[in-house]
Curated annotation (Swiss-Prot):
Domain of life, per lineage: Eukaryota
Keywords annotated in UniProt: Virulence
Organism: Botryotinia fuckeliana (strain B05.10)
Protein's name according to its UniProt entry: Botcinic acid biosynthesis cluster B protein 14
Function: Part of the gene cluster B that mediates the biosynthesis of botcinic acid and its botcinin derivatives, acetate-derived polyketides that contribute to virulence when combined with the sesquiterpene botrydial. Botcinic acid and its derivatives have been shown to induce chlorosis and necrosis during host plant infection, but also have antifungal activities. Two polyketide synthases, BOA6 and BOA9, are involved in the biosynthesis of botcinins.
Known pathway: Polyketide biosynthesis
Length: 56
């Protein structure tokens, strides 16, 4: 099945958006853990798993 150029561009844009969000969330978690706030059940590993699913 041929994927049109438009769809490819849209998918790339979506991936870039997800990538940016992912980095923002990782940064936030790093900042929070520096302040000793670790009551979050979401670890960088969980986020990595979610991110990996999106980037398939």
């Amino acid at each position: 099945m041929e994927v049109s150029a438009r769809v490819r561009v849209l998918m790339q844009h979506a991936l870039h958006t997800i990538e940016r969000r992912y980095k923002q969330v990782l940064l936030l978690i790093q900042q929070l853990s520096q302040h000793g706030i670790q009551s979050y059940s979401i670890s960088p590993f969980h986020i990595h798993c979610i991110y990996s699913c999106y980037s398939l």
